[in-house]
Swiss-Prot record:
Keywords: Cytoplasm, Nucleus, Protein transport, Repeat, Transport. The lineage of its organism: Eukaryota, Viridiplantae, Streptophyta, Embryophyta, Tracheophyta. Its main location: cytoplasm. Transmembrane segments: none annotated. GO terms for cellular component: cytoplasm; nucleoplasm; nucleus. Functions in nuclear protein import as nuclear transport receptor. Serves as receptor for nuclear localization signals (NLS) in cargo substrates. Is thought to mediate docking of the importin/substrate complex to the nuclear pore complex (NPC) through binding to nucleoporin and the complex is subsequently translocated through the pore by an energy requiring, Ran-dependent mechanism. At the nucleoplasmic side of the NPC, Ran binds to the importin, the importin/substrate complex dissociates and importin is re-exported from the nucleus to the cytoplasm where GTP hydrolysis releases Ran. Residues 317-337 are annotated as: Disordered. The gene is TRN1. Pfam families: HEAT (PF02985), HEAT_EZ (PF13513), IBN_N (PF03810). It is found in: Cytoplasm; Nucleus, Nucleoplasm. HEAT repeats lie at residues 14-40, 45-83, 92-125, 131-168, 178-208, 221-248, 260-287, 303-381, 389-420, 432-459, 477-510, 518-551, 559-597, 605-653, 664-695, 703-740, 748-784, 792-825, 834-866. It comes from Oryza sativa subsp. japonica (Rice). Belongs to the importin beta family. Importin beta-2 subfamily. It comes from the Eukaryota. Residues 317-330 have a biased composition (Acidic residues). This is Transportin-1.
Length: 891
């Protein structure tokens, strides 16, 4: 190829070769890997990008598809290599793109706009002044292609880097956005829909950053939005709705004077014949409520808004769910049916987050779901006040029993579920009637009515369990439980999924109330296990794991184990180490191991060894995929580590024989140093669990474990991976209790990291704050002589954190440390006495008699040290309730 020069020209042979490759590249039957390899070869030549831009800009006679392919390849190349290109080539690419802004072919114009946007992100305004001159010329022309091409390029720049047009640039009299803004607003009145759309799209990109150019033109912009609200183009109407939603989210004060008019427009747009416009408008109601606008402004619209939402909650005729709903269990799952799954790494001290209870989270967000979410939000804001409008509509829809009205009936059931939380005060007295009405719908002929009924019942699970002691409450609970189990065995895959998810929700709420029903529950779940396909098996594993979490050791009976363990073990043995269907099974076994406790020991050895093998095979795959026979996937490691933690928690010291005969210690240390945060997080959780039950087997590499864990607590690591830091902190505390003074080499390092966490402003991870306070206490307890000289740096913040921790054995450990600190240096702690008193008063009851006596000694010691006058002065600074609680310690 020719070298780049001021007057660069392509060589015919090179041009022909690249054209041939590009033609092959866009052919569906070609060997893409080979072509890509050849393109990579050509990309080594310094003027390769010159050829690509030449083809894009001047490729007359070539197919538009090949020219477009050249442009897209150029875009990717520029992103990766522009800064290292010869200056002459850089200039050539820029100069060739500008004349093509107004190309007659729309696909070429669009590709040029995309390339310009990518190149602009690299060179910015100052590096390409000529671009803005060219854009101005195109906007000033009366040629639609030129105007559209310029607007398309500006839109893509605004979309990617809007802030870059709002900068002062040497050589330009004004910021680019100041020049463009009036032109964009003028285009609101264009007779061409594409220009109105692009102009509005450009300005909408600036709502969040709000440059002065837009702020100063706000009245004109708002008036433009009002004028475009009834635009004949659905694309424009959609962007108008998007603008109102963004404005109320980030600049509600701007909308307040116009709120009534805007709300009226959005209500009308919510009924738009175009579903995308209606969807965008529907987002307004949740946004309105989320920014805490005065709800009274919306109240007058409720009688018209609620019927609109309910109407839009019916399935549209082209909803993809309608086709899916017809699939029964005989239809094999396709790969695309499997939802992406995300394993949550083990976190010590965290509350389990609630699952998204959307009835069909896998599918695309649509008007039906947005309307249901809007009704949910309105019910939480207005509570029972929406019931007089909503309930007659629901009853009217439910009364329509003809087959043609099934979508309206289904929407009515969905709405009953949507208002479960917000309207429960008004609905609770009628819960028996609601449940009595819903249960027969579990057997409706339409599968989507059966599935939504499962979801709606799950939304009331908490309240159904609360009603158990009411008259007929237990009978009601039993009917729901059996009804959902019946649907778990439905022949329709969609209903199976909804029933299984709903049953898992009921399990979480019911907990020990499930114990009398364990036999029938397990029989149904394992019957489903024999017939479910891959997608629903994942949900079934979750239901089994949730059941184990809910009933705990009650599951540890031979009559139950015989029902569910043999099928699980069979599946466990069938799945290869590289099969991703292992993930949900590993998670399920984790819950079962914790629930069964020592009862899991009969299954433990093969499960333990499989976990070790999984981690080892992934470590091999990381460095040599061919030898491992599979690609590296860290999730296998994370799930295996978490199951080992479950075994440690369930078996307790019973895991010792398994650990002693394995290489777990060395594998675990390697995982604690992994570059992936979620691997380190699970590894450190396992380190803490093993510290509790068999610290002796960590001993040979103890200092390495301590150093690795301590490293996770430095401020940068805490900032980057707070959950890893949380588990490291907890693991160090667990080790401290077991190994005592052997932890002394890292004590000062750890304390110096914990103090900033304790002193951090509110908003830091609550679990990390609590674990830091507990671990600091444990270090103080085992090494008081090392920590005591530094107590004035942390005592007050530490005591504040101790106040927030619930009563348990970990808090007891921390207070043993507090007492050890004060005993080691009573005068050093006297300046923090009021904080110590508040911490001591935070207990509801200290169960440990020894600790109670220690606290009594500390407080009485200070009372004697200060004398009656000093003590009374200290007490006068405390809340009366705190002083009253301190009376329990004899002061």
């Amino acid at each position: 190829m020719a070298a780049a020069a001021a007057l660069w020209q392509p060589q015919e042979e090179g041009l022909r070769e690249i054209c041939t490759l590009l033609d092959a590249h866009i052919s569906p039957n070609s060997d893409q890997a080979r072509i890509w390899q050849q393109l990579q070869h050509y990309s080594q030549f310094p003027d390769f990008n010159n050829y690509l831009v030449f083809l894009l800009a001047r490729g007359e006679g070539k197919s538009f598809e090949a020219r477009q392919a050249a442009g897209l390849l150029l875009k990717n190349n520029l992103r990766a290599t522009f800064s290292s290109m010869p200056p002459a080539s850089q200039q050539y690419v820029k100069s060739e793109l500008l004349p093509c802004i107004g190309a007659t072919n729309k696909a070429i114009r669009s590709t040029v706009g995309t390339v310009i946007s990518v190149l602009f992100q690299i060179v910015r305004v100052a590096g390409w002044i000529e671009l803005f001159q060219a854009l101005h010329q195109c906007l000033d022309s009366n040629d639609l292609d030129h105007m559209e091409g310029a607007m398309d390029a500006i839109y893509k720049i605004c979309e990617d880097v809007p802030e870059e047009l709002d900068v002062d640039v040497p050589g330009l009299p004004e910021r680019p956005i100041n020049v463009f803004m009036p032109r964009l607003l003028q285009f609101f009145q264009s007779t061409h829909a594409i220009l109105r759309k692009l102009a509005l799209g450009c300005i909408n990109q600036y709502i969040v950053v709000m440059p002065a150019a837009l702020y100063m033109s706000m009245d004109q912009y708002l008036q433009g939005l009002f004028n475009l609200a009834k635009d004949p183009s659905a694309d424009v109407r959609k962007l108008v709705c998007s603008a109102w939603v963004q404005l109320i989210e980030v600049r509600p004060s701007i909308l307040e004077p116009h709120l009534k008019n805007v709300t009226e427009l959005m209500l009308q747009a919510n009924k738009d014949s175009d579903d995308e416009v209606a969807l965008e408008a529907c987002e307004f109601w949740s946004a309105y409520c989320d920014v805490s606008m005065p709800p009274e402004g919306l109240r007058e619209f409720l009688p018209r808004l609620i019927p609109t939402l309910l109407s839009n909650m019916s399935y549209s005729d082209d909803d993809e769910s309608l086709a899916d709903a017809e699939e029964d269990e005989s239809f094999p799952d396709r790969d695309q049916d499997l939802k992406p799954r995300f394993h949550a790494s083990r976190l010590h001290g965290s509350e389990t987050g609630e699952d998204d209870d959307d009835d069909d989270a896998v599918n695309v967000w649509n008007l039906r779901k947005c309307s249901a979410a809007g009704l949910d939000v309105l019910s939480n804001v207005f509570g029972d006040d929406i019931l007089p409008t909503l309930m007659p509509l629901i009853q009217q829809n439910l009364a329509r029993t003809d087959d043609d009205a099934w979508k309206e009936r289904e929407a009515a059931v969905l709405s009953i579920g949507a208002i479960a939380e917000g309207c429960i005060t008004g609905l609770y007295p009628h819960l028996p009637q609601i449940v009595a009405f819903l249960i027969p719908l579990l057997d409706d002929k339409f599968p989507l009515i059966r599935s939504i009924t499962c979801w709606t019942l799950s939304r009331y699970s908490k309240f159904i369990v609360q009603s158990l002691e009411h008259p007929n409450g237990r009978e009601q609970f039993d009917k729901i439980l059996l009804g959902l189990l019946r649907r778990v065995l439905d022949t329709n895959k969609r209903v199976q999924e909804a029933a299984c998810s709903a049953f898992a929700t009921l399990e979480e709420e019911a907990a020990e109330e499930l114990v009398p029903h364990l036999g029938i529950i397990l029989q149904h779940l394992m019957c489903a296990y024999g017939k479910y396909q891959r997608r629903n098996l994942r949900i079934l594993y979750d239901a089994l794991g949730t059941l184990a979490d809910a009933v705990g050791a009650e599951l540890n009976q031979a009559k139950y184990l015989d029902i569910f363990m043999p099928p699980l073990i069979t599946k466990w043995q069938q799945l290869a180490n590289s099969d991703k269907d292992l993930f949900p099974l590993l998670e399920c076994f984790t819950s079962i191991a914790q629930a069964l406790g020592p009862g899991f020991s009969q299954f433990a050895e093969p499960v333990f060894q499989r976990c070790i093998n999984l981690i080892q095979s992934q470590h091999l795959a990381k460095v040599d995929p061919a030898a491992a026979g599979a690609l590296y996937d860290k999730e296998f490691i994370v799930c295996a580590l978490d199951l080992l933690s479950g075994l440690a928690e369930g078996l307790g010291a019973g895991i010792e024989s398994l650990v002693s005969q394995s290489s777990l210690r060395d594998i675990l240390l390697q995982c604690c140093m992994d570059e992936a945060a979620d691997v380190r997080q699970s590894a450190l959780a396992l380190l803490g669990d093993l510290s509790r039950v068999c610290p002796i087997h960590l001993h040979p590499r103890l200092q390495e474990f301590l150093n690795v864990a301590a490293k996770q607590l430095n401020p940068q690591c805490v900032k980057e991976a707070v959950s890893v830091a949380n588990n490291a902190c907890w693991a160090i505390g667990e080790l401290a209790i077991k190994i005592g003074k052997e932890i002394s080499p890292v004590v000062i390092t750890v304390v110096s990291c914990l103090v900033p966490i304790l002193k951090s402003p509110e908003g830091l991870n609550k679990s990390l704050l609590e674990n830091s306070a507990i671990t600091l206490g444990r270090l103080c307890w085992v090494c008081p002589d090392i920590v005591a000289p530094h107590m004035d740096h942390f005592m007050q913040a530490w005591c504040n954190a101790l106040c927030m921790i619930r009563d348990d054995f970990e808090k007891e450990d921390a207070f043993h440390g507090l007492c050890a600190m004060v005993a080691a240096n009573p005068t050093g702690a006297v300046g923090s006495l009021t904080f110590i008193c508040q911490a001591c008063a935070s207990w509801n009851e200290i169960k440990s008699e020894g600790l109670h006596n220690e606290v009594c000694q500390i407080l009485n010691g200070y009372k004697q040290m200060l004398g009656s006058g000093g003590w009374e002065q200290c007490m006068s600074t405390l809340e009366p309730a705190v002083v009253q609680r301190l009376g329990r310690y004899g002061v």
